[in-house]
């Protein structure tokens, strides 16, 4: 059951390490309209370290070994955009409407799996 969304990862070293660490499952933490969860063993190469994120961004916070998914305002937001508590490395983006995650605000766990890229036929 639950909500299923797809995300596309960027071609960065941090994103590749996250992909290799999958599948990952664990307790889901909520901070405003941000979900975050531990994904241990990933080195943060900080290619895109920033506090500027958009709704739908998937980011890694190396200091906490945490993957974050932004789907709305956070407690630090001044406007409509989410604001992370610290600099994060944007590693990907939700495909479709990230606001769908609002339906999972009471979820206790999250599972992130790999979807293998489509292989060309022929």
What is the predicted function of each stretch?
Residues 1:
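Hydrophobic alpha-helical positions that pack around
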Residues 7, 11-122:
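Glycine-rich active-site loops that engage anionic ligands at enzyme catalytic sites
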């Amino acid at each position: 059951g639950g909500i299923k969304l797809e995300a596309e990862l960027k071609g960065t070293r941090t994103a590749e390490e996250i992909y290799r660490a999958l599948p990952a499952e664990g307790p889901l933490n909520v901070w405003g309209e941000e979900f975050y969860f531990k994904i241990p063993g990933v080195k943060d190469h900080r290619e895109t370290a920033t506090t500027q994120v958009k709704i739908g961004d998937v980011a890694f916070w190396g200091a906490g070994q945490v993957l974050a998914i932004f789907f709305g305002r956070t407690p630090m937001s001044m406007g409509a955009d989410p604001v992370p508590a610290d600099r994060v490395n944007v590693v990907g983006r939700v495909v479709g409407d990230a606001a769908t995650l609002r339906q999972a605000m009471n979820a206790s766990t999250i599972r992130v799996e790999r979807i293998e890229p489509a292989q060309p036929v022929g």
